[in-house]
């Protein structure tokens, strides 16, 4: 899995888990396909604090985040996943002798860093006056919308989606994230995910120019994280400190090989630490 794909899934799971059930890489039955993220909200959840993202997840949704703008073939593949899920729900309702409520059926949200006018027009997608700029809805039959992240207004309401953008869009969002109060739980958790993404990109030597701009914004936080890791190692013993950090890095999506390289450990040391984790 590409570093950004892992980051996007972990990031959305971090934000949405308090609100309902999150399934990452959910398989659909017609063939070997996986939905990036399938979310079912808890009835009592109140996602208002997530702004536009919270509005999206008021009901059951499929979310497909893209690092690069999807082409028409990729969008058709997303639609196929949605149609498969809808067909499964219809069959389930029939088996259980229940009515199938189309209004409560899942929706598909495609998150793209940008969307060309040609693509939008080819999809028959339109802006909705009740939604911000950059949110394009396909004809209602398809229960699908595509969000051009770079077109979203720069407001607090869109912050959590703009963090999944690219280049200047993402860099601006990271700056806003850093300005949040340090006691903000999401601030700390998301920064940790961003730092993990940076480590993974550096290890794989796949930093792009626009990524470097974002990582420059994160540089001070990254240095603070490294210093904290060193202090932790000194306080608990150098090796013990490294071993303590393995479960956290694993949870953030780094592979065994990446963790070993980042912490300067043998692969066997990392594997053993993972096995001993409760």
Name what the model sees in each region.
Residues 63, 147, 164-278:
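Short, charged alpha-helical interaction segments and adjacent helix-coil junctions
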Residues 1-206:
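Conserved single-residue anchors adjacent to enzymatic active/cofactor-binding motifs
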